[in-house]
Protein backbone atom coordinates (compact mmCIF):
# COMPACT_ATOMS: atom_id res chain seq x y z
CA UNK A 1 0.00 0.00 0.00
CA UNK A 2 1.05 3.58 -0.63
CA UNK A 3 -1.48 5.09 1.78
CA UNK A 4 -0.96 5.67 5.50
CA UNK A 5 -3.33 6.95 8.19
CA UNK A 6 -7.06 6.90 8.90
CA UNK A 7 -8.27 10.47 9.48
CA UNK A 8 -5.11 12.33 8.45
CA UNK A 9 -4.30 10.22 5.42
CA UNK A 10 -1.38 10.45 3.00
CA UNK A 11 -0.82 8.70 -0.32
CA UNK A 12 2.66 8.99 -1.81
CA UNK A 13 3.66 8.38 -5.42
CA UNK A 14 6.63 8.60 -7.77
CA UNK A 15 10.03 7.03 -8.38
CA UNK A 16 13.57 8.33 -7.99
CA UNK A 17 14.13 8.93 -11.71
CA UNK A 18 10.53 9.58 -12.72
CA UNK A 19 9.15 13.03 -13.51
CA UNK A 20 8.21 13.79 -9.92
CA UNK A 21 7.71 12.60 -6.38
CA UNK A 22 4.46 13.55 -4.74
CA UNK A 23 1.85 13.12 -2.05
CA UNK A 24 -1.89 13.58 -1.66
CA UNK A 25 -2.90 14.60 1.86
CA UNK A 26 -6.49 14.12 3.01
CA UNK A 27 -8.07 15.08 6.31
CA UNK A 28 -6.63 18.58 6.73
CA UNK A 29 -9.22 20.99 8.14
CA UNK A 30 -10.08 24.15 6.24
CA UNK A 31 -8.37 27.32 7.38
CA UNK A 32 -4.84 26.05 8.06
CA UNK A 33 -2.16 28.44 6.80
CA UNK A 34 -0.01 26.65 4.21
CA UNK A 35 2.31 27.73 1.40
CA UNK A 36 4.79 26.06 -0.91
CA UNK A 37 7.55 27.75 1.10
CA UNK A 38 6.40 25.94 4.24
CA UNK A 39 6.91 22.62 2.48
CA UNK A 40 10.14 23.66 0.80
CA UNK A 41 11.59 24.72 4.16
CA UNK A 42 11.14 21.20 5.52
CA UNK A 43 12.52 19.62 2.34
CA UNK A 44 15.66 21.75 2.55
CA UNK A 45 16.34 20.33 6.02
CA UNK A 46 16.93 16.91 4.41
CA UNK A 47 19.44 18.10 1.79
CA UNK A 48 22.76 18.41 3.72
CA UNK A 49 24.42 19.76 0.55
CA UNK A 50 27.18 21.31 2.68
CA UNK A 51 28.52 17.76 3.04
CA UNK A 52 28.54 16.68 -0.64
CA UNK A 53 29.15 12.96 -0.03
CA UNK A 54 25.89 12.84 1.93
CA UNK A 55 23.91 14.19 -1.02
CA UNK A 56 25.81 14.19 -4.33
CA UNK A 57 22.55 14.68 -6.23
CA UNK A 58 21.87 17.86 -4.20
CA UNK A 59 18.71 18.66 -6.08
CA UNK A 60 16.99 22.03 -5.51
CA UNK A 61 13.47 21.18 -4.42
CA UNK A 62 10.87 22.53 -6.85
CA UNK A 63 7.56 22.24 -5.01
CA UNK A 64 4.08 22.80 -6.38
CA UNK A 65 0.80 22.60 -4.50
CA UNK A 66 -1.70 21.50 -7.13
CA UNK A 67 -4.89 21.47 -5.08
CA UNK A 68 -6.45 21.99 -1.69
CA UNK A 69 -4.96 25.43 -0.95
CA UNK A 70 -6.29 28.85 -1.89
CA UNK A 71 -4.74 32.21 -1.01
CA UNK A 72 -2.48 30.59 1.58
CA UNK A 73 -5.15 28.59 3.41
CA UNK A 74 -6.26 24.98 3.17
CA UNK A 75 -9.76 24.40 1.83
CA UNK A 76 -10.57 21.18 3.64
CA UNK A 77 -10.18 19.22 0.40
CA UNK A 78 -7.34 16.88 -0.63
CA UNK A 79 -3.98 18.62 -0.92
CA UNK A 80 -1.83 17.40 -3.81
CA UNK A 81 1.88 18.25 -3.72
CA UNK A 82 4.49 17.44 -6.38
CA UNK A 83 8.27 17.73 -6.09
CA UNK A 84 9.88 17.68 -9.52
CA UNK A 85 12.89 15.48 -10.22
CA UNK A 86 15.46 17.50 -12.17
CA UNK A 87 19.00 16.19 -11.59
CA UNK A 88 18.47 12.68 -12.86
CA UNK A 89 21.31 10.65 -14.43
CA UNK A 90 19.89 7.26 -15.35
CA UNK A 91 22.85 6.10 -17.48
CA UNK A 92 24.63 4.83 -14.34
CA UNK A 93 21.93 2.21 -13.95
CA UNK A 94 21.92 0.74 -17.47
CA UNK A 95 24.53 -1.89 -16.63
CA UNK A 96 22.64 -2.78 -13.43
CA UNK A 97 19.44 -3.76 -15.21
CA UNK A 98 18.45 -7.26 -14.00
CA UNK A 99 21.50 -7.28 -11.71
CA UNK A 100 20.11 -6.48 -8.26
CA UNK A 101 22.37 -4.66 -5.83
CA UNK A 102 23.04 -6.73 -2.69
CA UNK A 103 21.30 -5.23 0.33
CA UNK A 104 18.95 -3.15 -1.83
CA UNK A 105 15.23 -3.65 -2.48
CA UNK A 106 16.10 -4.34 -6.15
CA UNK A 107 16.00 -8.09 -5.48
CA UNK A 108 12.70 -8.05 -3.57
CA UNK A 109 11.10 -5.82 -6.22
CA UNK A 110 12.18 -8.25 -8.94
CA UNK A 111 10.65 -11.16 -7.03
CA UNK A 112 7.37 -9.27 -6.64
CA UNK A 113 7.09 -7.27 -9.88
CA UNK A 114 9.35 -9.13 -12.31
CA UNK A 115 11.07 -7.12 -15.02
CA UNK A 116 8.51 -4.31 -14.78
CA UNK A 117 9.97 -2.57 -11.74
CA UNK A 118 11.92 0.68 -12.21
CA UNK A 119 15.44 0.08 -10.89
CA UNK A 120 16.83 3.51 -11.84
CA UNK A 121 18.04 5.28 -8.73
CA UNK A 122 16.29 2.62 -6.68
CA UNK A 123 12.92 3.50 -8.18
CA UNK A 124 10.09 3.37 -5.68
CA UNK A 125 12.46 2.04 -3.00
CA UNK A 126 14.82 5.03 -3.23
CA UNK A 127 15.44 7.36 -0.33
CA UNK A 128 14.35 10.08 -2.74
CA UNK A 129 10.76 8.97 -2.20
CA UNK A 130 10.94 10.16 1.40
CA UNK A 131 10.71 13.71 0.03
CA UNK A 132 6.98 13.03 -0.30
CA UNK A 133 6.82 11.97 3.34
CA UNK A 134 8.67 15.11 4.41
CA UNK A 135 6.21 17.24 2.42
CA UNK A 136 3.33 15.57 4.27
CA UNK A 137 5.19 16.08 7.53
CA UNK A 138 5.35 19.81 6.89
CA UNK A 139 1.55 19.87 6.97
CA UNK A 140 1.31 17.45 9.89
CA UNK A 141 3.64 19.60 12.00
CA UNK A 142 1.23 22.50 11.54
CA UNK A 143 -1.59 20.28 12.79
CA UNK A 144 0.49 19.35 15.85
CA UNK A 145 1.17 23.01 16.56
CA UNK A 146 -2.58 23.59 16.90
CA UNK A 147 -2.50 21.19 19.86
CA UNK A 148 0.70 22.70 21.30
CA UNK A 149 2.87 19.75 20.25
CA UNK A 150 6.07 19.56 18.22
CA UNK A 151 8.57 17.01 16.91
CA UNK A 152 12.37 17.16 16.63
CA UNK A 153 15.18 14.64 16.35
CA UNK A 154 18.95 14.20 16.29
CA UNK A 155 21.63 11.68 15.34
CA UNK A 156 22.81 9.45 18.18
CA UNK A 157 25.15 7.13 16.28
CA UNK A 158 26.92 7.20 12.92
CA UNK A 159 29.47 4.75 11.60
CA UNK A 160 29.89 3.20 15.03
CA UNK A 161 30.49 6.58 16.72
CA UNK A 162 27.97 7.15 19.53
CA UNK A 163 27.11 10.32 21.42
CA UNK A 164 28.25 10.41 25.04
CA UNK A 165 26.60 13.45 26.58
CA UNK A 166 23.53 14.29 28.65
CA UNK A 167 21.05 16.54 26.86
CA UNK A 168 17.58 18.07 26.94
CA UNK A 169 14.96 18.52 24.28
CA UNK A 170 16.17 22.08 23.82
CA UNK A 171 19.66 20.72 23.12
CA UNK A 172 18.15 18.43 20.48
CA UNK A 173 16.56 21.39 18.69
CA UNK A 174 19.71 23.51 18.99
CA UNK A 175 21.83 20.72 17.49
CA UNK A 176 20.41 21.63 14.07
CA UNK A 177 22.67 24.69 14.11
CA UNK A 178 25.65 22.35 13.62
CA UNK A 179 26.81 20.68 10.36
CA UNK A 180 24.86 17.60 11.48
CA UNK A 181 22.23 17.51 14.25
CA UNK A 182 24.41 15.96 16.96
CA UNK A 183 24.29 17.17 20.59
CA UNK A 184 27.83 15.97 21.39
CA UNK A 185 30.52 18.06 19.66
CA UNK A 186 33.28 15.48 20.15
CA UNK A 187 31.10 12.74 18.69
CA UNK A 188 30.16 15.04 15.80
CA UNK A 189 33.82 15.61 14.92
CA UNK A 190 34.44 11.86 14.83
CA UNK A 191 31.28 11.28 12.78
CA UNK A 192 32.40 13.80 10.17
CA UNK A 193 35.75 12.01 9.95
CA UNK A 194 33.96 8.68 9.56
CA UNK A 195 31.86 10.07 6.72
CA UNK A 196 34.96 11.14 4.79
CA UNK A 197 36.67 7.82 5.52
CA UNK A 198 33.70 5.91 4.10
CA UNK A 199 33.69 8.11 0.99
CA UNK A 200 37.42 7.54 0.45
CA UNK A 201 36.88 3.78 0.75
CA UNK A 202 33.97 3.83 -1.67
CA UNK A 203 31.87 2.41 1.14
CA UNK A 204 28.96 3.49 3.31
CA UNK A 205 27.94 3.70 6.98
CA UNK A 206 24.75 3.32 9.00
CA UNK A 207 23.68 4.69 12.35
CA UNK A 208 20.88 5.64 14.69
CA UNK A 209 18.62 8.61 15.34
CA UNK A 210 16.32 9.69 18.14
CA UNK A 211 13.01 11.49 17.67
CA UNK A 212 11.17 13.42 20.38
CA UNK A 213 7.56 14.58 20.43
CA UNK A 214 6.71 17.03 23.21
CA UNK A 215 3.42 18.62 24.17
CA UNK A 216 1.48 15.58 22.98
CA UNK A 217 -1.78 15.43 24.97
CA UNK A 218 -2.62 12.36 27.04
CA UNK A 219 -5.16 9.86 25.79
CA UNK A 220 -4.02 9.34 22.19
CA UNK A 221 -4.00 5.72 21.05
CA UNK A 222 -6.12 2.64 21.66
CA UNK A 223 -5.64 -0.36 23.99
CA UNK A 224 -4.87 -2.98 21.36
CA UNK A 225 -4.60 -2.58 17.59
CA UNK A 226 -4.53 1.20 17.54
CA UNK A 227 -1.66 1.58 19.99
CA UNK A 228 0.19 4.83 19.37
CA UNK A 229 3.52 3.06 19.81
CA UNK A 230 2.61 0.37 17.29
CA UNK A 231 1.44 2.95 14.75
CA UNK A 232 4.61 5.02 15.10
CA UNK A 233 6.73 1.86 14.83
CA UNK A 234 4.91 0.83 11.65
CA UNK A 235 5.45 4.33 10.28
CA UNK A 236 9.14 4.27 11.23
CA UNK A 237 9.75 1.02 9.38
CA UNK A 238 8.22 2.52 6.24
CA UNK A 239 11.38 4.66 5.94
CA UNK A 240 13.89 2.90 3.66
CA UNK A 241 16.78 1.30 5.52
CA UNK A 242 15.18 1.18 8.98
CA UNK A 243 16.26 -2.00 10.78
CA UNK A 244 15.64 -1.61 14.54
CA UNK A 245 13.69 0.50 17.05
CA UNK A 246 14.03 1.19 20.79
CA UNK A 247 11.18 2.92 22.65
CA UNK A 248 11.96 5.11 25.65
CA UNK A 249 14.97 3.60 27.39
CA UNK A 250 14.39 0.47 25.33
CA UNK A 251 16.80 -2.38 25.90
CA UNK A 252 18.31 -0.65 28.93
CA UNK A 253 14.87 -0.79 30.55
CA UNK A 254 14.59 -4.51 29.83
CA UNK A 255 17.72 -5.15 31.92
CA UNK A 256 16.38 -3.43 35.05
CA UNK A 257 14.43 -4.81 38.00
CA UNK A 258 10.75 -3.97 37.73
CA UNK A 259 11.04 -1.70 40.75
CA UNK A 260 13.75 0.26 38.91
CA UNK A 261 12.00 0.32 35.55
CA UNK A 262 8.67 1.69 36.79
CA UNK A 263 8.09 5.45 36.49
CA UNK A 264 6.61 6.74 39.79
CA UNK A 265 3.28 8.57 39.49
CA UNK A 266 3.03 11.98 41.11
CA UNK A 267 1.01 15.21 41.02
CA UNK A 268 2.21 18.38 39.28
CA UNK A 269 0.14 21.54 38.84
CA UNK A 270 -2.88 19.71 40.20
CA UNK A 271 -2.68 16.88 37.67
CA UNK A 272 -1.31 13.33 37.84
CA UNK A 273 1.86 12.72 35.84
CA UNK A 274 4.99 10.59 35.78
CA UNK A 275 7.87 11.64 38.02
CA UNK A 276 10.32 10.12 35.52
CA UNK A 277 9.88 9.12 31.90
CA UNK A 278 11.86 5.96 31.28
CA UNK A 279 8.92 4.48 29.38
CA UNK A 280 8.94 7.22 26.70
CA UNK A 281 5.54 8.84 27.11
CA UNK A 282 3.32 5.83 26.38
CA UNK A 283 1.68 3.22 28.65
CA UNK A 284 -0.64 0.50 27.36
CA UNK A 285 -0.45 1.99 23.88
CA UNK A 286 -1.85 5.34 25.06
CA UNK A 287 -0.02 8.65 25.54
CA UNK A 288 0.28 9.90 29.13
CA UNK A 289 1.35 13.50 28.45
CA UNK A 290 5.08 13.12 29.06
CA UNK A 291 7.49 13.50 26.11
CA UNK A 292 7.56 10.69 23.57
CA UNK A 293 11.04 9.59 22.55
CA UNK A 294 12.39 6.62 20.63
CA UNK A 295 15.41 5.58 18.58
CA UNK A 296 15.59 3.98 15.15
CA UNK A 297 18.66 2.45 13.51
CA UNK A 298 19.37 2.46 9.78
CA UNK A 299 21.63 0.12 7.84
CA UNK A 300 24.47 1.39 5.60
CA UNK A 301 23.55 2.50 2.08
CA UNK A 302 23.55 -0.64 -0.13
CA UNK A 303 25.10 1.14 -3.13
CA UNK A 304 28.89 1.13 -2.71
CA UNK A 305 31.88 1.41 -5.04
CA UNK A 306 33.18 -2.04 -4.21
CA UNK A 307 32.77 -5.35 -6.07
CA UNK A 308 29.57 -7.07 -4.91
CA UNK A 309 28.37 -10.55 -5.76
CA UNK A 310 24.95 -10.83 -7.39
CA UNK A 311 23.15 -12.66 -10.20
CA UNK A 312 22.42 -11.61 -13.77
CA UNK A 313 18.71 -12.41 -13.71
CA UNK A 314 18.44 -12.29 -17.49
CA UNK A 315 20.93 -15.15 -17.77
CA UNK A 316 20.48 -16.66 -14.30
CA UNK A 317 24.25 -16.64 -13.87
CA UNK A 318 26.41 -15.33 -10.99
CA UNK A 319 28.13 -12.04 -11.70
CA UNK A 320 29.89 -9.17 -9.94
CA UNK A 321 28.84 -5.53 -9.98
CA UNK A 322 30.56 -2.35 -8.84
CA UNK A 323 28.35 0.72 -8.53
CA UNK A 324 29.67 3.76 -10.42
CA UNK A 325 26.84 6.22 -9.93
CA UNK A 326 26.07 8.82 -7.28
CA UNK A 327 25.25 7.50 -3.84
CA UNK A 328 24.85 8.84 -0.31
CA UNK A 329 27.65 7.67 1.97
CA UNK A 330 25.00 7.51 4.70
CA UNK A 331 21.22 7.76 4.58
CA UNK A 332 21.02 8.49 8.30
CA UNK A 333 20.74 12.33 8.19
CA UNK A 334 18.03 12.28 5.51
CA UNK A 335 16.28 9.40 7.25
CA UNK A 336 16.10 11.45 10.44
CA UNK A 337 14.12 14.20 8.70
CA UNK A 338 11.80 11.61 7.15
CA UNK A 339 11.33 9.97 10.56
CA UNK A 340 10.41 13.30 12.14
CA UNK A 341 7.88 13.78 9.34
CA UNK A 342 6.20 10.38 9.52
CA UNK A 343 6.03 10.69 13.32
CA UNK A 344 4.23 14.01 12.91
CA UNK A 345 1.88 12.41 10.37
CA UNK A 346 1.05 9.59 12.81
CA UNK A 347 0.42 11.96 15.70
CA UNK A 348 -1.71 14.27 13.54
CA UNK A 349 -3.79 11.26 12.54
CA UNK A 350 -4.35 10.35 16.20
CA UNK A 351 -5.26 13.94 17.11
CA UNK A 352 -8.00 13.82 14.48
CA UNK A 353 -9.10 10.33 15.53
CA UNK A 354 -9.48 11.54 19.12
CA UNK A 355 -11.46 14.59 18.02
CA UNK A 356 -8.93 16.99 19.53
CA UNK A 357 -8.59 18.55 16.09
CA UNK A 358 -11.84 18.75 14.11
CA UNK A 359 -11.81 18.30 10.35
CA UNK A 360 -15.56 18.89 9.87
CA UNK A 361 -15.44 22.64 10.41
CA UNK A 362 -12.99 25.48 9.61
CA UNK A 363 -10.25 26.31 12.06
CA UNK A 364 -10.77 29.42 14.16
CA UNK A 365 -8.38 32.22 13.24
UniProtKB/Swiss-Prot annotation:
One of its GO terms (biological process) is chorismate biosynthetic process. Its cofactor is FMNH2. It catalyses: 5-O-(1-carboxyvinyl)-3-phosphoshikimate = chorismate + phosphate. Its EC number is 4.2.3.5. GO terms for molecular function: chorismate synthase activity; FMN binding. NADP(+) binds at residue 46. FMN binds at residues 124-126, 284, 299-303, 326. InterPro entries: Chorismate_synth, Chorismate_synth_AroC_sf, Chorismate_synthase_CS. GO terms for cellular component: cytosol. It comes from the Archaea. Pathway: Metabolic intermediate biosynthesis; chorismate biosynthesis; chorismate from D-erythrose 4-phosphate and phosphoenolpyruvate: step 7/7. The keyword DNA-binding does not apply. Belongs to the chorismate synthase family. PANTHER family: CHORISMATE SYNTHASE. This reaction introduces a second double bond into the aromatic ring system. This is Chorismate synthase. The lineage of its organism: Archaea, Thermoproteota, Thermoprotei, Thermoproteales, Thermoproteaceae.
